Amino acid sequence: MHRRGIRLMGELVPYMHGWGEFDGQSWMEIMDLADDYSLLCCYHTPFAFAMGPMLSAHPNVTFVAAHPGDRERVEEHIRLMKQHDNLYLDLSGTGLFRLGVLRHLVTQVGAERILFGTDSPWMDQRHTLDLFLALPLSPEAQARILYQNALELYGLQTWIE
């Protein structure tokens, strides 16, 4: 598949796919292959704390944590993002716009590893976009999160240049 241009996997939800938990052996074997090919992996984020060993063991995989949820879970991701440069966060389908959580996230880790809605074809993004645009973020941070990070991460810059 890699020879045919496949560069990413996701959204992976190990406990739904029958692979056990994020730190289980089946999941590790899949990520070992992803690491061999430097793939991007989007995964469901119920338990960020279980991802630390996975992130450390697979430095060639770019992990995208989708819809990180409430402030407590976001704090777990912030801690991991500060330790692992190969972790990004996707805002799709999330309540991050409540209580200044997104602004806190940007303050803590910067806008360079945050994506807007790349894992969310199942819901109308107009309302989420309106909420996002109302946040007190710089135009540069908005641009990074809304499209620039995705263009770079998914290698799409050349498609629009």
Positions of the model-derived regions?
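Short, charged beta->alpha transition segments
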Residues: 1-3, 51
